[in-house]
């Protein structure tokens, strides 16, 4: 009963946030997103997937935060998406739930984290996401329209990884925090030196969507 009440409260909160920002989801998608938040919380008690010193609910700080990417990039049915360094499935699993016609590959170099992702994907019956224990260097012969990352790595390094596996015209989308001016400058300088990706880097502040997202940005490199 307690779990049911908690899930109902979480769903009502998520619906309020999504409706406010015109994020359209079905009842089944809401149920899966709340289910994922509960599973992530449970798994995080076993292995360290996200910080255990959370200052905000997982549903907002991690799940809703991931969904905001869809306000700045519309995923398509023909799109192949890589979630690089997915950790506990972020942002890949929430986005796979919200865009069931888009294919998502989640990779991480830590086997325990991928095992958790695989279990959650199976429990939630998500058909369009696959989690693989791998490093980006091992994804030989694969290419993607979009690369996602929530890693703390510098943007220049993430751009370097993405440039090797992005299709022409592809983009890297990152969830990052703090003042990014120096990171963006370095990433663009790296392009000038090496003659490669990215040509343009845009940053979109998301602090207006929740007090939890102070100094948070969605960064899109093309």
UniProtKB/Swiss-Prot annotation:
InterPro entries in the cross-refs: rRNA_ssu_MeTfrase_G (IPR003682), SAM-dependent_MTases_sf (IPR029063)
GO CC annotation terms, alphabetical: cytosol
Domain of life according to the entry: Bacteria
Localization: Cytoplasm
EC number: 2.1.1.-
CDD domains: AdoMet_MTases
Residues binding S-adenosyl-L-methionine, per UniProt: 85, 90, 108-110, 136-137, 150
GO molecular function, one term: rRNA (guanine-N7-)-methyltransferase activity
Transmembrane region(s): none
Family: Belongs to the methyltransferase superfamily. RNA methyltransferase RsmG family.
Name listed for the protein in its UniProt record: Ribosomal RNA small subunit methyltransferase G
Lineage per the UniProt record: Bacteria, Pseudomonadati, Chlorobiota, Chlorobiia, Chlorobiales
């Amino acid at each position: 009963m307690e779990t049911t009440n908690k899930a109902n409260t979480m769903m009502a909160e998520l619906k309020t946030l999504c409706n406010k920002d015109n994020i359209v989801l079905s009842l089944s998608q809401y149920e899966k997103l709340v289910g994922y938040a509960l599973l992530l919380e449970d798994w995080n008690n076993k292995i360290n997937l996200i910080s255990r010193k959370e200052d905000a609910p997982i549903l907002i700080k991690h799940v809703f935060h991931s969904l905001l990417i869809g306000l700045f990039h519309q995923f398509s049915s023909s799109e192949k998406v890589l979630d690089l360094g997915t950790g506990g499935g972020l942002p890949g699993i929430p986005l796979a739930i919200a865009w069931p016609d888009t294919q998502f590959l989640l990779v991480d170099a830590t086997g325990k984290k991928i095992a958790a992702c695989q279990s959650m994907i199976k429990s939630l019956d998500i058909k369009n996401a696959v989690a693989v224990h791998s490093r980006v260097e091992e994804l030989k012969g694969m290419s993607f329209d979009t690369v996602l990352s929530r890693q703390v790595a510098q943007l220049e390094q993430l751009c370097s990884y993405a440039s090797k596996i992005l299709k022409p015209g592809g983009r890297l989308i990152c969830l990052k925090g703090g003042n990014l001016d120096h990171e963006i400058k370095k990433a663009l300088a790296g392009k000038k030196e090496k003659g490669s990706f990215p040509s343009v880097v845009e940053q979109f502040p998301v602090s207006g969507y929740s007090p939890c997202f102070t100094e948070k940005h969605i960064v899109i490199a093309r």
